Amino acid sequence: MANNPSSKKRARQQVKRRAHNMSLRSMVRTYIKKVSAQIEQGSYDGATQALTTAAPIIDSMVNKGIFSKNKAARTKSRLNAKIKALKAS
Protein backbone atom coordinates (compact mmCIF):
# COMPACT_ATOMS: atom_id res chain seq x y z
CA MET A 1 0.00 0.00 0.00
CA ALA A 2 1.16 3.52 -0.78
CA ASN A 3 2.31 5.37 2.30
CA ASN A 4 3.94 8.62 1.30
CA PRO A 5 2.38 11.25 -0.98
CA SER A 6 4.52 10.48 -4.02
CA SER A 7 3.70 6.78 -3.93
CA LYS A 8 -0.01 7.59 -3.51
CA LYS A 9 0.19 9.79 -6.58
CA ARG A 10 1.97 7.05 -8.53
CA ALA A 11 -0.76 4.60 -7.53
CA ARG A 12 -3.44 7.00 -8.81
CA GLN A 13 -1.55 7.46 -12.06
CA GLN A 14 -1.17 3.71 -12.52
CA VAL A 15 -4.93 3.22 -12.25
CA LYS A 16 -5.57 5.86 -14.92
CA ARG A 17 -2.81 4.55 -17.17
CA ARG A 18 -4.02 0.97 -16.86
CA ALA A 19 -7.57 1.94 -17.82
CA HIS A 20 -6.31 3.92 -20.81
CA ASN A 21 -4.02 1.11 -21.97
CA MET A 22 -6.83 -1.43 -21.65
CA SER A 23 -9.08 0.68 -23.88
CA LEU A 24 -6.31 1.01 -26.49
CA ARG A 25 -5.66 -2.74 -26.39
CA SER A 26 -9.37 -3.39 -26.83
CA MET A 27 -9.50 -1.02 -29.81
CA VAL A 28 -6.65 -2.88 -31.53
CA ARG A 29 -8.29 -6.23 -30.88
CA THR A 30 -11.47 -4.90 -32.49
CA TYR A 31 -9.56 -3.92 -35.63
CA ILE A 32 -7.95 -7.36 -35.75
CA LYS A 33 -11.37 -8.99 -35.39
CA LYS A 34 -12.68 -6.89 -38.29
CA VAL A 35 -9.90 -8.23 -40.52
CA SER A 36 -10.59 -11.78 -39.35
CA ALA A 37 -14.31 -11.35 -40.00
CA GLN A 38 -13.63 -10.27 -43.58
CA ILE A 39 -11.38 -13.30 -44.05
CA GLU A 40 -14.09 -15.59 -42.66
CA GLN A 41 -16.59 -14.13 -45.13
CA GLY A 42 -14.17 -14.76 -47.97
CA SER A 43 -13.97 -11.12 -48.97
CA TYR A 44 -10.45 -10.51 -50.31
CA ASP A 45 -10.99 -6.79 -51.00
CA GLY A 46 -12.65 -6.21 -47.65
CA ALA A 47 -9.90 -8.05 -45.82
CA THR A 48 -7.10 -6.13 -47.53
CA GLN A 49 -8.84 -2.84 -46.84
CA ALA A 50 -9.39 -3.79 -43.19
CA LEU A 51 -5.72 -4.80 -42.83
CA THR A 52 -4.62 -1.55 -44.47
CA THR A 53 -6.62 0.29 -41.82
CA ALA A 54 -5.47 -1.90 -38.93
CA ALA A 55 -1.71 -2.10 -39.65
CA PRO A 56 -0.81 1.53 -38.81
CA ILE A 57 -2.90 1.37 -35.66
CA ILE A 58 -1.11 -1.79 -34.55
CA ASP A 59 2.23 -0.08 -35.23
CA SER A 60 1.22 2.99 -33.23
CA MET A 61 0.40 0.75 -30.26
CA VAL A 62 3.96 -0.59 -30.43
CA ASN A 63 5.26 2.97 -30.13
CA LYS A 64 3.01 3.52 -27.12
CA GLY A 65 4.20 0.32 -25.48
CA ILE A 66 0.83 -1.44 -25.57
CA PHE A 67 2.15 -4.32 -27.68
CA SER A 68 5.66 -5.60 -28.20
CA LYS A 69 7.29 -5.18 -31.59
CA ASN A 70 7.38 -8.94 -32.13
CA LYS A 71 3.70 -9.45 -31.28
CA ALA A 72 2.67 -6.72 -33.71
CA ALA A 73 4.83 -8.14 -36.49
CA ARG A 74 3.55 -11.67 -35.84
CA THR A 75 -0.08 -10.53 -35.86
CA LYS A 76 0.26 -8.58 -39.10
CA SER A 77 2.18 -11.42 -40.73
CA ARG A 78 -0.43 -14.02 -39.83
CA LEU A 79 -3.30 -11.84 -41.04
CA ASN A 80 -1.46 -11.14 -44.28
CA ALA A 81 -0.77 -14.85 -44.79
CA LYS A 82 -4.47 -15.64 -44.34
CA ILE A 83 -5.37 -12.96 -46.87
CA LYS A 84 -2.87 -14.36 -49.39
CA ALA A 85 -4.30 -17.85 -48.86
CA LEU A 86 -7.77 -16.42 -49.43
CA LYS A 87 -6.66 -14.93 -52.75
CA ALA A 88 -5.02 -18.18 -53.84
CA SER A 89 -8.16 -20.21 -53.23
From Swiss-Prot:
GO cellular component, one term: small ribosomal subunit
GO molecular function terms listed in the Swiss-Prot or TrEMBL record: small ribosomal subunit rRNA binding; structural constituent of ribosome
Keywords: Ribonucleoprotein, Ribosomal protein, RNA-binding, rRNA-binding
Keyword rRNA-binding listed: yes
SUPFAM superfamilies from the UniProt entry: Ribosomal protein S20
GO biological process: translation
InterPro entries reported in the protein's UniProt record: Ribosomal_bS20 (IPR002583), Ribosomal_bS20_sf (IPR036510)
Family, similarity comment: Belongs to the bacterial ribosomal protein bS20 family.
Function: Binds directly to 16S ribosomal RNA.
Protein name: Small ribosomal subunit protein bS20
Organism expressing this protein natively: Hahella chejuensis (strain KCTC 2396)
